[in-house]
A protein has these predicted regions:
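PRPP-associated nucleotide enzymes
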Residues: 1-178
């Protein structure tokens, strides 16, 4: 049985807050390159980019972390990114920050390709995870598996307007934890 974790209204309020923060940050910039890292970030990204008033160029790396509730290795496609950002600012939009490895790897790629200031914003940051994002909408316990608002389980539940967890369901990884 699914249990509501964050309502659509709570999510919208946080997206608005993050949009306001990013608008102050990017108010002087002509163009911001926005990189959406994970498939699960798609709805969060769609709502957030519409709140940002600076002109943006959108890029998608199309990564994915999970098969069902089991953590897998991340697979991103950096070939979708420009070869040179010409020192333009880059906004990275992530769904859930776990280990931070994918973001560290992406920051390295972006820096090699001439990115200006890099800002990472995530929908969730797992409690106890390394701080690799400048902004996160919500915190999430390490063992909790969530769906909705773009996040899925085996391709299902992405379309839900709120974020839910399943009662008595926890994530598992290769070592039994995230």
């Amino acid at each position: 049985m699914m249990k509501l974790l964050y309502s659509a209204e709570a999510i919208a309020a946080r997206v608005n807050d993050l949009g306001d923060t990013l608008n102050r940050q990017y108010k002087e910039h002509k163009t911001v390159h926005t990189v959406v890292t994970m498939n699960g970030a798609s709805i969060f990204a769609a709502d957030l980019v519409r709140r940002i008033t600076a002109p943006q160029v959108l890029h998608y790396t199309g990564g994915s972390y999970f098969k069902g509730a089991i953590k897998q290795e991340v697979a991103m496609n950096p070939e979708t990114l420009p070869s040179n950002f010409n020192q333009a600012p880059v906004l990275v939009i992530e769904d859930i920050l776990d280990s931070g490895n994918a973001i560290r790897q992406l920051r390295h790629i972006l820096a090699e390709r001439g990115a200006g200031p890099i800002t990472v914003v995530s929908l969730f940051k797992r409690i106890g995870s390394p701080s690799v994002a400048e902004h996160s909408a919500f915190s999430l316990p390490r063992e909790l598996f969530v769906v909705g608002y773009g996040l899925d389980m085996d391709g299902r539940y992405r379309e839900l307007p709120a974020i839910y967890t399943f009662e008595n369901t926890v994530m598992t990884g290769q070592s039994g934890q995230c």
